[in-house]
Amino acid sequence: MPDNLTEEKAVTWVKSILALNLNTIENDTEVLDQGGVFALIGPTGVGKTTTTAKLAARYVMKHGTKNLGLITTDAYRIGGHEQLRIYGKILGVMVHAVKDEADLKIALNELKNKHTILIDTVGVSQRDRMVAEQIAMLSNTNMPIKKLLCLNATSTGETLTDVIRAYKGKGLDGCLMTKLDEAATIGNALDVIIKEKLKLYYVANGQRVPEDIHLANKQYLIQHALKLSASSNQSFQFLNDELPFVMGDTVNAANASQLSGMSYA
């Protein structure tokens, strides 16, 4: 930090450095417009299925159902794929359930003419050997798959670092931050994302589909991460009524009332 800065200028300097190092996408072009195959990966309970449904709904509202494909690898757990199937039925998009690399290759071949394919993966603890198997399965297909890691904003910095390093495998294309509505602080998550040089695509702050997913707005995220809460003396805390201002533009959910009424853990 430069010497002889006033407190106000020092804070401004810190914000500018954080903004310079926090890599985010500016709009939906990199996902919904550009298209491709995207796999949402991460530990159990981080919100992968709901986030996949939110992205699917966001795509349908912008481009329609014809060129969207949905795949779930959660075929082993009893009822594991049913949640995404319900969303798929509402959206009018068939969900393909796969259980191994061979199934995945078949499903991708069937969907090869789709503009965008979203893959919801089974949740695996970062310390489970199945993580390596899952990454290998996603890496050994005939189509390039972009791997987006879902990070729980309520987790500690140590846990998030552990998750990222376990799932990195042959490389991550980016991440999404989930459960912002449950987090007392987002400083840990932002710190780890910056240190691990991950691109932050979206943030999710609730269970509603498709409303509760937003493009990450780095200026607001940093501003609120640096706030101190006088009542709790905790850094990086922001209030629930501030959440809408932390995010980028939300989608217009006027045509998704059916989805809005659905809520899953």
Where are these regions (language model features)?
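Primarily NTPase-proximal linker/entry elements flanking Walker-type ATP/GTP-binding cores
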Residues: 1-68, 72-75, 86-87, 91-93, ...
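Residue-level signature of catalytic and energy-coupling elements of molecular machines
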Residues: 49, 74, 84, 120, ...
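Conserved catalytic network of the ASCE P-loop NTPase/AAA+ motor domain
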Residues: 61-63, 88-91, 109-113, 139-143, ...
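Conserved beta-strand/loop subsegment of P-loop NTPase cores
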Residues: 67-69, 143-151, 168-183, 187-205, ...
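Conserved nucleotide-binding/hydrolysis micro-motifs of P-loop NTPases
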Residues: 75-78, 102-103, 123-126, 153-157, ...
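Conserved ATPase-coupling elements of RecA-like P-loop NTPase cores
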Residues: 80-81, 126-134, 159-161, 186-188
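Inter-motif core of Ras-like GTPase G domains
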Residues: 109-116, 130-154
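NTP-binding/hydrolysis catalytic cores, primarily Walker-type P-loop NTPases
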Residues: 193-265
